[in-house]
Amino acid sequence: PKGSDGALVLVDATSAAGGLDLDTSQSDCYYFAPQKSFASDGGLWMAIMSPAAIARAEKIKVSGRWVPAFFDLSIAIENSRLDQTYNTPALATIILLAEQLNWMNKNGGLKFAASRSEDSSNRLYNWAEKTSYTTPFVTDPAMRSKVVGTINFDENIDALEIAKILRANGIVDTDPYRKLGKNQLR
């Protein structure tokens, strides 16, 4: 990429892939798991790699440096050239990913998906800012995710009870980040 002075530029897009516009010329390795925007389970890793990133993985492989097979990019590259994976992913992961990609492509591709994510996140954050008992977890609008929105609730409102009601009505995966211990939904 321009301005990288030969250094590889890697982008961890796990929470963004499929919900933000992408210019592959600006990174050497854009990698993600197909959860979030792709409506799939974790456990599968995907990457768009430049020739420079592939060459670096091959250079490491022939250097004799020990890398566990699970982390060896050259194995992933070799398998991808054979349309295979090193470990067999759950079939549901592949089906969910394929269905989501079909839906995205049918509606206009990545531009559609990014626009839809932007619109949805704007609605969520605008609602949270205007409502007396909610606030966006990330207060700086420039730093907020357009793919995963997290909303704090006033302490006298039980966010876990809201999540339970949402789940009973078919809206799933809204539970808060447990490690934060906050009264929130995402």
Regions found by a protein language model. Give the residues of each.
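Active-site C-terminal subdomain of aminotransferase-like
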Residues: Q35-Y125
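Conserved C-terminal alpha-helix-loop-beta "cap" of PLP-dependent enzymes
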Residues: E129, Y133-R186
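Short coil/turn connectors at secondary-structure junctions
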Residues: S4-A7, S25-S27, D41-L44, K182
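Short His-Asn-centered micro-motif
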Residues: V11-A13, A33-P34, I165, T174
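Conserved active-site segment immediately N-terminal to the catalytic lysine
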Residues: L10, T24-Q35
